[in-house]
């Protein structure tokens, strides 16, 4: 049996439900969701679970929902007048402790989103994210190294690019991070949302946001440089301990998503419980 055929309870017997999902009601304004996402994007929760008036999950709101709608409505009206229920992604993946890893990852591939919810013993839901699966990667046994992972082009941006160009590139290339050209720094949906919330007052005093050049108050984050010889378990352990997991070699960048997809390999063994 390969690692991909093991169930979530076999892979994470002690910690599967240890991360409660974070919820927000559908009638809350978007600025509330954006403020919450500043703290949760790229964490073990990563997205907000949207609930109805009966507190039942109806979908998700994450970084992509915010930046996509900013691109379409780059004004404070989006944050102050729009409700979370109007931008929710209703394609919510629900799993159980008996779901195997392959089934989970195939669902993530179909939705282009590494996030699921799982019922817990407290009557609520726990979050299962790409960040969570780094724990699985850290405990696997394999000779797979970073150099064995699929090649993907580094998507970059330049100093004179506008925020409109940057956000459009994220959406076009289905990525949440762009590398600053010829550097080891990056911008992400989290950084954009954090800047809008904390520095630009949810665009209440800002006009023509999409025409803003990349400059202050936007601040970049650093990518950690690693060797191509780093194996999958070591990479997982490294990312697991990072606040914002993102690493690069001379020619490639890698996120927890890449680790998750590598776990589908038949060349990985795992001591299941």
Task: Describe the predicted segments one by one.
Residues 55, 122-123:
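A structural signal for short beta-strand/turn segments enriched in small hydrophobics and glycine
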Residues 2-20, 62-93, 105-109, 124-156, ...:
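Tandem CBS (Bateman) regulatory domains
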Residues 174-192:
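Short, structured interface segments that constitute the first stable element of a domain
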Residues 22-45, 51, 93-113, 119-120, ...:
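The conserved cystathionine-beta-synthase
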Residues 1-61, 65-68:
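Hydrophobic, helix-prone linear segments
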Residues 114-117, 126-128:
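Amphipathic alpha-helical protein-interaction segments
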């Amino acid at each position: 049996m390969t690692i991909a055929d093991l169930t979530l309870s076999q892979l994470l017997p002690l910690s599967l439900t240890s991360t409660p999902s974070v919820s927000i009601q559908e009638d809350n304004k978007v600025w509330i969701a954006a403020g919450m996402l500043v703290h949760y994007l790229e964490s073990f929760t990563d997205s907000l679970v949207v609930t109805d008036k009966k507190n039942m999950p109806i979908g998700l709101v994450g970084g992509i929902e915010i930046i996509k709608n900013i691109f379409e409505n780059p004004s404070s009206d989006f944050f102050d007048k729009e409700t979370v229920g109007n931008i929710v992604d209703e394609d919510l993946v629900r799993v159980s402790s008996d779901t195997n890893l392959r089934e989970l990852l195939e669902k993530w591939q179909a939705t282009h989103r590494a996030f699921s919810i799982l019922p817990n013993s407290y009557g609520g839901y726990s979050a299962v994210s790409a960040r969570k699966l780094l724990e699985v990667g850290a405990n696997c046994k394999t000779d797979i190294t970073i150099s064995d992972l699929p090649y993907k082009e580094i998507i970059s941006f330049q100093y004179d690019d506008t925020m409109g160009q940057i956000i459009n590139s994220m959406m076009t290339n289905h990525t949440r991070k762009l590398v600053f050209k010829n550097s080891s720094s990056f911008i992400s949906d989290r950084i954009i949302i954090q800047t809008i919330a904390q520095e630009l007052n949810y665009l209440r005093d800002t006009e023509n946001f999409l025409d803003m050049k990349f400059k202050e108050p936007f601040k970049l984050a650093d990518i950690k440089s690693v060797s191509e010889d780093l194996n999958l378990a070591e990479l997982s352990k490294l990312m697991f301990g990072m606040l914002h997991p993102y690493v690069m070699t001379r020619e490639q960048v890698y996120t927890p998503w890449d680790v998750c997809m590598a776990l589908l390999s038949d060349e990985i063994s795992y001591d299941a419980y």
